[in-house]
């Protein structure tokens, strides 16, 4: 009886297929532009669903729909039959027969193995994608853009309207429990339609899980009398000749019809364009009007990634088989997808029942798909951020370049402080645009082009890498304009993947690895390694490594804004504006030390301390360069008081109180030719004397190149006990008295007997000045001459001296010895 009854509905179903197709195509007219995308994935889906699951006890015509369903779901152990509803002619119901063993279990591992081989390694599991993790198993068979999908969708309600005659079937109570939720759900949201569809699909996967989700009210799985009415309502949406069979209330019929139409639109739209499934399900259903928050967009992107991954899984599961049967499969697979999307919304016992059914269908792949779902959800969120940040960075790249250049000009302080503020401002700007300018649709075309999990994983990892690089690009590294003293590594191109950093002309020192922005800074820095001082002061000849140091020196010591007393060197006529510089010049160049006396009142003019005894003359070199700086400091500290300068020879430690006397000493003792006419009106520091002595400065400078070495001299206490007579002989000119010999009349003898005999007889006249600041004294005729050469010429022509130079040496020697002898007697 079943065969005879089932044949007419089959014919009717085949005849009514075009009408159902027309109805579904009307719903697809709004989405017709996506119809060209689906055929790209058709071959993989068609080959993956050809499973020989025909029931042996049913005819091919009657089992066409159920067999296709069993192929789609992989339920080879379940057989179906069309039963006529009692008391209703022309109304049939699809009845599930007892489980029969088939070759399907053999195909299960074959379906799961290739999918497991292509699953990516899960890396990140966001907490809010717990629901999405249960959605992934449903997306195994999502996409097959076949042309007969609408017909298959309408053929299922046609074959299923008959009420069941076997209430003892296993999965009958579940659809019955879930039917009220279908009637109670609102009719305007596609999410509700998915929920209702999922209720039936989750609880009766062995029966007709694929078609039931698409047309939930049309699934005849309960024995209650309300099922025929619900089934008639479903048939009303697909077929016109079932309208008279409706027995339920009008509002529920209208609601169920709206739900069915929305589900059909979503199904066909996802069949034709898998990338729009997330938009059809999520954007239309859950997003309210007005501003769109971030979480809905992240979920939508997650759904899109799920769809793409499911396509790859279908490609992995593809098996050879005829394409004619696969043309009717795509719409049924979408029902299975819609059924599992609401798995998390079901009660606990229902979810457990659903998990049991799914484990019977494909147990090994469920866990892997869950992991992949979590991975894809996290990747979709990060990829969404990656799509937004580059646009903003490209928009602000010009401003950032100008900002960096300005900061490099401002200086070190602002370069270190302002970049952080700019980075915070930039982050705030990006965050603002991220919340108000989401563009999830722009992500869909790029993700839809992926064909395998490997490529998806690679792109996903690339997105993570770009996200990390973009985060790093906002750090202070991108402000790489360090200053001279910065020890950071040499800047490189921080921005990759299309973002190139601003190259800066950095120069590195190969010795200490320091970096400098300007080449001139590097040159000045290299002078510190070579001890080269190319910048010297033209006034005091002090040299520096950097030009800035020389500028500072000129401002401090030789600047015109400061009122200074310019000091001229007595030997080389150089001008100095600072007392320390002048003293340093005398020590280094002319070997003359300037010091002070302990106290002006303690010593009388006749008791002025002398520096050195003639007995220790041979030890000149051992005491030359010590304590010079200390004496300078004493002079500077006490220069406010009335002190007497002591000009000491740095070689023999002889002290004088005028530069003229020390010049004569250098000329006589050390043989330094200092040309200059020292007249009575001249004084230390006079310009005439300085100009005459300029030419003698260079040889002395070359003979003594060492600089800055301190010289040691006797302290003031030692000076008080050393040679007071020599000091008196050299400094009697300060009192304005020139001691000359009273015994006139030159004698033919030498000056030595005259000195020796005059000394004991006249102790007050035993001392005389052979030379003074006023000139040279002739001991023979008491004539004053201005220069030594004049004195020697005078001796030669006036006094007929054969060797004036020898006479000068003898007089100089006797004079020194006589002074020493007289001083010893005076002390007694």
Swiss-Prot record:
Ubiquitous. The keyword Repressor applies. Keywords: DNA-binding, Metal-binding, Nucleus, Repeat, Repressor, Transcription, Transcription regulation, Zinc, Zinc-finger. SMART domains: ZnF_C2H2. Residues 689-721 have a biased composition (Basic and acidic residues). Residues 1-29, 143-173, 193-231, 680-721 are annotated as: Disordered. One of its GO terms (cellular component) is cytosol. GO terms for biological process: negative regulation of DNA-templated transcription; regulation of transcription by RNA polymerase II. Its main location: nucleus. It is found in: Nucleus. Disulfide bonds: none annotated. One of its GO terms (molecular function) is DNA-binding transcription factor activity, RNA polymerase II-specific. Gene3D superfamilies: Classic Zinc Finger (3.30.160.60). Residues 16-29, 150-159 have a biased composition (Polar residues). It comes from the Eukaryota. A zinc finger (C2H2-type) spans 507-529, 535-557, 567-590, 776-799. Belongs to the krueppel C2H2-type zinc-finger protein family. Isoform 1 acts as a transcriptional repressor. PANTHER family: ZINC FINGER PROTEIN, ZINC FINGER PROTEIN 438. This is Zinc finger protein 438. It comes from Homo sapiens (Human). The gene is ZNF438.
């Amino acid at each position: 009886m079943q065969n005879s009854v089932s044949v007419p509905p089959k014919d009717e179903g085949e005849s009514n297929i075009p009408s159902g197709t027309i109805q579904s195509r009307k719903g697809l007219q709004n989405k017709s532009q996506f119809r060209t995308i689906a055929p790209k994935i058709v071959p993989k889906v068609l080959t993956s669903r050809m499973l020989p699951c025909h029931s042996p006890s049913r005819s091919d015509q009657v089992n066409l729909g159920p067999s296709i369903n069993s192929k789609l779901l992989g339920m080879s152990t379940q057989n179906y039959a069309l039963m006529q509803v009692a008391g209703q002619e022309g109304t049939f119901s699809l009845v599930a027969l007892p489980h029969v063993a088939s070759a399907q279990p053999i195909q299960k591992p074959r379906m799961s193995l290739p999918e497991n081989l292509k699953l990516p390694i899960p890396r990140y599991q966001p907490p809010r994608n717990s629901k999405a993790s249960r959605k992934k198993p449903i997306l195994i068979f999502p996409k097959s853009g076949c042309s007969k999908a609408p017909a298959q969708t309408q053929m299922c309600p046609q074959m299923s309207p008959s009420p069941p005659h076997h209430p003892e079937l296993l999965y009958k109570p579940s659809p019955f429990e879930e039917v009220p939720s279908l009637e109670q759900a609102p009719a305007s949201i596609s999410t509700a339609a998915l929920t209702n569809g999922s209720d039936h699909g989750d609880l009766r996967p062995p029966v007709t899980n694929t078609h039931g989700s698409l047309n939930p009210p049309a699934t005849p799985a309960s024995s209650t009398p309300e099922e025929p009415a619900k089934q008639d309502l479903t048939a009303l949406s697909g077929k016109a000749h079932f309208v008279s069979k409706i027995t339920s209330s009008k509002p529920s019929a209208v609601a169920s019809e709206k739900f069915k139409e929305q589900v059909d639109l979503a199904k066909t739209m996802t069949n034709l364009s898998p990338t729009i499934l997330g938009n059809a399900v999520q954007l239309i259903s859950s997003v309210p009007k007005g501003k769109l928050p971030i979480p809905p967009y992240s979920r939508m992107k997650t759904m899109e990634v799920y769809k793409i991954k499911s396509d790859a899984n279908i490609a992995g599961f593809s098996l050879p088989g005829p394409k004619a049967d696969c043309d009717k499969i795509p719409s049924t697979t979408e029902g299975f997808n819609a059924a599992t999307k609401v798995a998390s919304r079901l009660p606990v016992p229902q979810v457990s029942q659903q998990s049991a059914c799914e484990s019977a269908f494909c147990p090994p792949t469920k866990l892997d798909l869950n992991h992949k779902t979590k991975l894809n959800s996290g990747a979709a969120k990060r990829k969404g951020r990656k799509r937004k940040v580059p646009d903003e960075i490209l928009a602000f790249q010009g401003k950032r370049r100008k900002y960096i250049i300005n900061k490099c000009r401002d200086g070190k302080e602002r370069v270190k402080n302002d970049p952080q503020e700019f980075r915070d401002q930039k982050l705030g700007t990006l965050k603002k645009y991220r919340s108000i300018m989401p563009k999830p649709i722009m992500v869909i075309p790029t993700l839809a082009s992926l064909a395998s999990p490997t490529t998806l994983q690679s792109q996903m990892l690339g997105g993570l890498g770009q996200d990390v690089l973009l985060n790093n690009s906002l750090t202070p590294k991108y402000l790489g304009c360090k200053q001279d003293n910065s020890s950071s590594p040499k800047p490189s191109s921080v921005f990759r993947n299309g973002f190139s950093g601003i190259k800066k002309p950095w120069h590195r020192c190969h010795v200490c690895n320091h970096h400098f922005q300007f080449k001139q800074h590097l040159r000045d820095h290299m002078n510190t390694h070579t001890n080269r001082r190319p910048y010297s002061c033209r006034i005091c000849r002090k040299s520096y490594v950097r030009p800035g140091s020389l500028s500072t020196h000129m401002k401090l010591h030789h600047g015109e804004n400061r009122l200074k007393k310019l000091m001229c060197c007595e030997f080389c006529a150089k001008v100095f504006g600072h007392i320390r510089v002048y003293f340093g010049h005398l020590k280094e160049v002319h070997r003359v030390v300037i010091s002070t006396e302990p106290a002006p009142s303690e010593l009388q003019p006749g008791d002025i301390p002398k520096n050195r005894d003639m007995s220790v003359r041979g030890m000149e070199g051992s005491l030359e360069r010590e304590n010079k700086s200390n004496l300078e400091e004493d002079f500077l500290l006490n220069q406010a008081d009335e002190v007497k300068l002591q000009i000491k020879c740095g070689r023999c430690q002889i002290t004088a109180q005028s530069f003229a006397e020390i010049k004569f000493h250098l000329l006589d003792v050390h043989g330094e030719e200092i040309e200059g006419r020292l007249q009575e009106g001249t004084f230390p520091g006079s310009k005439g004397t300085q100009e005459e002595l300029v030419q003698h400065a260079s040889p002395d400078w070359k003979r003594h190149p060492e600089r800055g070495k301190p010289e040691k001299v006797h302290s003031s206490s030692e000076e008080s006990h050393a040679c007071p007579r020599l000091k008196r002989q050299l400094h009697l000119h300060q009192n304005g008295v020139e001691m000359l010999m009273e015994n006139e009349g030159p004698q033919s003898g030498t000056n030595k007997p005259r000195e020796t005999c005059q000394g004991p007889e006249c102790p007050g006249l035993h001392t005389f000045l052979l030379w003074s600041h006023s000139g040279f004294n002739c001991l023979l005729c008491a004539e004053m001459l201005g220069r030594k050469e004049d004195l020697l010429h005078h001796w030669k022509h006036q006094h007929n001296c054969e060797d004036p130079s020898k006479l000068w040496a003898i007089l100089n020697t006797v004079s020194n010895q006589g002074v020493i002898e007289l001083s010893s007697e005076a002390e007694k």
